[in-house]
Amino acid sequence: MSINATARALLLTEFVSAFFLTMRYFFQPKATINYPFEKNPISPRFRGEHALRRYPNGEERCIACKLCEAICPAQAITIEAGPRRNDGTRRTVRYDIDMVKCIYCGLCQEACPVDAIVEGPNFEFATETREELYYDKAKLLANGDRWEREIAKAIELDAPYR
């Protein structure tokens, strides 16, 4: 070992320089947030938990066109259309999304001509079993009812870019 290397090892110069570097950043404001108690604002384009929307009169928006089912790359959406009603429109009898398969790409939302299926702002939907991640029509409509205000605001903010 050379004298220079021995001197550096004895004086712990690397340790001291690392200590001063740590002290320099120690007194600066924190760059992180205290997550469960503080949350960053999310983008209007954020893709979270799926929801089915309703019209203001309470009627569901989905017209059973099955475009979302056809475009889904993960084949996570299953739709069964009911018979045509007297006014010629159709509604879904069954609308299921397998959230385990879903890759949250947003193609279903883009394909929907009536903005019925959307990916809402909720990202905290952890479950204890896989079966709870199979969303049926009732669960999706409940999500839509719960998050309608935030979803409508996000769609309005994103409208100039659509």
UniProtKB/Swiss-Prot annotation:
Cofactor-binding details, from the entry: Binds 2 [4Fe-4S] clusters per subunit.
Chain sites annotated for binding [4Fe-4S] cluster 1: 62, 65, 68, 112
SUPFAM superfamilies, A to Z: 4Fe-4S ferredoxins
Record: residues binding [4Fe-4S] cluster 2: 72, 102, 105, 108
Main location: membrane
E.C. numbers: 7.1.1.-
GO cellular component: plasma membrane
Domain 4Fe-4S ferredoxin-type stretches: 52-82, 93-122
Record keywords, A-Z: 4Fe-4S, Cell inner membrane, Cell membrane, Iron, Iron-sulfur, Membrane, Metal-binding, NAD, Quinone, Repeat, Translocase, Ubiquinone
Catalytic activity entry: a quinone + NADH + 5 H(+)(in) = a quinol + NAD(+) + 4 H(+)(out)
Cofactor field: [4Fe-4S] cluster
Membrane topology: Peripheral membrane protein
InterPro entries: 4Fe4S_Fe-S-bd, 4Fe4S_Fe_S_CS, NADH_quinone_OxRdtase_chainI
Single GO molecular function: NADH:ubiquinone reductase (non-electrogenic) activity
Organism superkingdom: Bacteria
Subcellular location(s) per record: Cell inner membrane
Gene Ontology biological process terms, A to Z: aerobic respiration
Family statement: Belongs to the complex I 23 kDa subunit family.
Function statement: NDH-1 shuttles electrons from NADH, via FMN and iron-sulfur (Fe-S) centers, to quinones in the respiratory chain. The immediate electron acceptor for the enzyme in this species is believed to be ubiquinone. Couples the redox reaction to proton translocation (for every two electrons transferred, four hydrogen ions are translocated across the cytoplasmic membrane), and thus conserves the redox energy in a proton gradient.
Subunit structure: NDH-1 is composed of 14 different subunits. Subunits NuoA, H, J, K, L, M, N constitute the membrane sector of the complex.
Name assigned to this protein: NADH-quinone oxidoreductase subunit I
Taxonomic lineage from the root: Bacteria, Pseudomonadati, Pseudomonadota, Alphaproteobacteria, Hyphomicrobiales
